């Protein structure tokens, strides 16, 4: 997104940047513009994809979910949640072989999480307090959608066992 031509193409395709604090505080302020585009997209009933982990690794586990997806959902809910509910659809992506080119993959969609209803049931007052229960719920739902193996020293051994048992 630092190259103007590439940035224009990415924005046209609705591939939007979410900047982290490690990229500099000045750059983090650009997330406000991205969030406005996301809210407008949701309000117009256009579906889009957001990767809440923000990165990947070749393991069948779930990385910590970033705040971006929750900030966007809560901002959209604050803007129009009374008239139209806001949903997050948990998705699991399972790779047949992470390192092999043209390997298989399986995309599984879970039951949509109605953010509007979920936060109504919370006894909290501010956005920061809403994020943690949302994060836990989405993490739990995503973990059910792929061969989830919790982090640990024997992660590779457990994955080998899962592959052997699936044959």
Regions found by a protein language model. Give the residues of each.
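Soluble catalytic domains of membrane acyltransferases
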Residues: 1-126
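Long, charge-rich alpha-helical interaction segments
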Residues: 125-167
């Amino acid at each position: 997104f630092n190259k103007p031509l590439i940035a224009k193409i990415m924005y046209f395709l609705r591939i939007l940047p979410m900047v982290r604090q490690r990229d500099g505080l000045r750059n983090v302020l650009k997330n406000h513009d991205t969030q406005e585009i996301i809210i407008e997209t949701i309000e117009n009933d256009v579906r889009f994809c957001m990767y809440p982990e923000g990165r990947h690794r070749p393991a069948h586990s779930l990385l910590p979910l970033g705040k971006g997806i929750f900030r966007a959902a809560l901002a959209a809910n604050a803007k129009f949640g009374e008239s139209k509910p806001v949903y997050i659809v948990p998705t699991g992506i399972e790779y047949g072989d992470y390192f092999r080119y043209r390997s298989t993959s399986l995309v599984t969609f879970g039951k949509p999480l109605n953010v509007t209803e979920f936060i109504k049931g919370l006894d909290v007052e501010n956005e920061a307090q809403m994020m943690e229960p949302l994060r836990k719920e989405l993490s739990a739902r995503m973990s059910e959608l792929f061969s989830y193996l919790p982090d640990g020293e024997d992660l590779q051994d457990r994955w080998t066992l899962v592959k052997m048992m699936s044959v």
